[in-house]
Every structure is written in structure tokens, then in C-alpha cells.
Amino acid sequence: MTTPTLIVTPPSPPAPSYSANRVPQPSLMDKIKKIAAIASLILIGTIGFLALLGHLVGFLIAPQITIVLLALFITSLAGNALYLQKTANLHLYQDLQREVGSLKEINFMLSVLQKEFLHLSKEFATTSKDLSAVSQDFYSCLQGFRDNYKGFESLLDEYKNSTEEMRKLFSQEIIADLKSSVASLREEIRFLTPLAEEVRRLAHNRESLTAAIEELKTIRDSLRDEIGQLSQLSRTLTSQIALQRKESSDLCSQIRETLSSPRKSASPSTKSS
């Protein structure tokens, strides 16, 4: 029997700091638009009532007052539409920021589990040659996890640098896929934490090491499947971003062609006149 070794408990995850991923404060122009939208919400009832009265008696008394009231009513509706457009984009950005924070917390928890499994692999290496081979397999599997999450971090950095494209490109289906991936990863972590405690207990009992090795191999296969799914998800996200960029460039070229075509058609008509 090997001497039991003390395992240091992992540190608690750091409190999420929102200094780096802070939601941008609205500018002066956004505040002015918000105030204008609120004012239009207050005035829309009175203006609508006055517009109805203007339709009834305006053409008999003063048609100019009717035209002014209708213009004010249309202006208030345009301000409300602009305010709703601004707030919808901001809510979508805040939802994406929350998903990014949850992915970072999961990355930290996986790094803590990586340290725990590395320590357990060193303990198993002292018991038998078979356990040393299993610890090497775990180490390679965890290295694959690290490489995969490095790719995720680089992808998240790219999303931060292109926030405007994220607001346009990301749809509710992609956000739902991210939420499902986060939920599956949390379930895996909840399953791995009690399993680590069970492995520590089984380290002192050589008769049950074979069963523990089989369980660890099955978990290793499931982790590899999760890595493949995450890699496939990152590929689909990258392909969707490239496709949306190509479509936006094609749309810009079509707009330029449509803007230039009226000028070309107008120039021969001026020459003939």
C-alpha cells in the first residue's frame, strides 16, 4: 500500500469582474434619443387626441393646424421606432455577454479539474504499470481539452473585437445551442466531481482498481466525444461568420450597383435634351 498523500482543495473561482466585459455606457446622442422617445410616449396620447379633433374640425376652421398635428404624430412614432431598435440591440449584446461570462466560469472549473486529475494520475502511477498508462491517457485527454478551450478563448476574443457583427449575425438558434452546450458541460462537471472523490477512495484498495480503470476509460471516451462536438460547433460558428460576411459584401456591391445605375441612366437623357 502506498502512503496517503494530502490533496490540496482547489481555490474558489474568482469573482467575475466586469471591467473587461463591461456593457458600454450609452453616449450623449443615445441619451438624447431616449429622452425624446420617452417624451414622445407622453405626448403621443394627447397628440393623437388632438389629431382626431383636428380631423373633425380642422378642415372647417384651420387646415394648417391639422397638418402640424399630423407631422408631430408621425415624428413621435418615428422616435419610438428608433428607441425600440436601439434597445433591442443592447439587450442582445447583454445576453451574449452573459453567455461569455458563463463560458469563462466553465473554463476555470475545467482547469481546476485538470489539476485534480493530474494529481490523481501521479498517485495511480505509483500503484501499477496499468494505472500509469491510464494516467498518460488522461493527461493527453486533458491536453486536448486545454487546446480546445484555447481555441474557444481566441474565438471569444474575435467576437469582442467585432461586437457590431455579432449583433447582426448571431440569431436565437445559435444562442440556444450555446446554452445547451453550457448545460451539458455543467452536467459533465457535476458527474466528474463525485467521481474524483470515489477515485481517491479507491486508490487505497487495489482489488477494485480494475473496475475504476474501466470507468475512467468510459469517461475518457465521453470527454473525447464532447471535445469533438465542441470542435464541430466552433467550425459551424466560423463558417456562419464567413458566410454572413460574404453575404454582407455581396449586398454592399448590389447596393452600389443600384445607386450607380440611376446616374448612368440619367446622363443619356440629359444629353438628348
UniProtKB/Swiss-Prot annotation:
What gene is this protein translated from? incA
* Region of interest (Disordered), ranges: 1-20, 254-273
- Per its database record, what is this protein's job? Chlamydia replicate within a host intracellular vacuole, termed an inclusion. IncA is probably involved in the homotypic fusion of inclusions.
**Record's subcellular location:** Secreted; Host vacuole, Host pathogen-containing vacuole, Host pathogen-containing vacuole membrane
- Which Gene Ontology cellular component terms are annotated? extracellular region; host cell membrane; pathogen-containing vacuole membrane
Q: How does it assemble?
A: Forms homooligomers.
Q: Describe its membrane topology.
A: Multi-pass membrane protein
Q: Which UniProt keywords apply?
A: Coiled coil, Host membrane, Membrane, Secreted, Transmembrane, Transmembrane helix, Virulence
Give the disulfide map: none
Q: What is this protein called?
A: Inclusion membrane protein A
Q: Where are the transmembrane segments?
A: 41-61, 64-84
Q: Please tell me the species this chain comes from.
A: Chlamydia trachomatis
Instruction: List each coiled-coil range.
Output: 170-233
